[in-house]
Amino acid sequence: MADTTGRIPLWLIGTVTGIIVIGLLGVFFYGSYSGLGSSL
């Protein structure tokens, strides 16, 4: 993994992308669940 042919390592891109996706999904599900709980 020390072979960084590009400017940004692939593992770094994957980690950042995963964190962003998980964060967006968490916010989306939390908002939908809290919205459903308040409406019901």
From Swiss-Prot:
Listed transmembrane segments: 8-28
UniProt entry tagged with the keyword Repeat: no
Keyword list, A-Z: Chloroplast, Membrane, Photosynthesis, Photosystem II, Plastid, Reaction center, Thylakoid, Transmembrane, Transmembrane helix
Coiled-coil regions, chain positions: none
Membrane topology: Single-pass membrane protein
InterPro entries documented for this protein: PSII_PsbJ, PSII_PsbJ_sf
HAMAP family: PSII_PsbJ
Family as reported in the entry's similarity comment: Belongs to the PsbJ family.
Record-given protein name: Photosystem II reaction center protein J
Record organism: Pinus thunbergii
